[in-house]
Amino acid sequence: MRSLWKGSISFGLVNIPVALYPATRSEELKFRLLRSSDLSPVNYKRVAQADGREVPWEQIVKGYEYEKGKFVVLKEDDFKRVDVEATQTVDIMDFVQLDEVNPMYFHKPYYLVPDKGGAPAYTLLHDVLTETKKAGIAKVVIRTRQHLAAVKAQGQALVLEIMHFAQELVDVGELDIPVAKGGAKRRELDMAKALVEQMTETWQPERYTDDYTSALMAMIKEKIESGGKTSGAAPKPRRATNVIDLAAVLQESLNQTGAGAKKKPAKTAKRGKSRKAA
């Protein structure tokens, strides 16, 4: 795997040479738009809204719409004037307790791998973050854009987690979330806790697969093999129902989970003492 860039982690006077690698991969299927008559791929053209004419690249400029229909044009020199220092450095500004950071701030992880001569300092930072349960909050430039990021210890590696800036998150106060008067009823709360307990498992991420993509890929293969035909009708979507009697629904859920996949094995019956022959 090729690194995205090579640079360094910087905090205080310490500089650790590292290489940045992606920690995720995209499994999304890609589709092309086609003309239905002959399946010819459809291309896009740059067309002006005013007259519908195609616009060549040399006549295109970037503009910011500050009012409806009003634009200010920005040239390449304008972007360069406000460009942040595009050094390939993970510049740690602060260290914070990891459990203080709302997980909603985390966006996308990358691996940081020590480069030549960086192993001792890399290991030191990794162990410090592990023992203190802290993360380094940094700024880093990736592909010409500056990001907020957290440097975290993950297993044997250091992970650079790209974060959202505070203004990018929607405040929950902007949402109209209804709350039941008096809170949840005690009986329903106890039953819900029992249901959660019955459904609790040890975290095993490999158990959770992308069933939609798998089914879609299987259908694509079927269409290829059958010349474009598919068998069977599409499943009917489930209709959402308004829950009126929560207690009854919870009890039914408890009955199903208790007798279903989580059913405990029956205990072996104890043998009684054998009687002596008369």
From Swiss-Prot:
A single GO BP: double-strand break repair via nonhomologous end joining
InterPro entries: Ku70/Ku80_beta-barrel_dom, Prok_Ku, SPOC-like_C_dom_sf
UniProt-listed CDD domains: KU_like
Annotated coiled-coil segments of the chain: none
GO molecular function: double-stranded DNA binding
UniProt KW keywords: DNA damage, DNA recombination, DNA repair, DNA-binding
Region (Disordered): 255-278
Family: Belongs to the prokaryotic Ku family.
NCBIfam families: Ku_bact
Protein name per its UniProtKB record: Non-homologous end joining protein Ku
Source organism: Opitutus terrae (strain DSM 11246 / JCM 15787 / PB90-1)
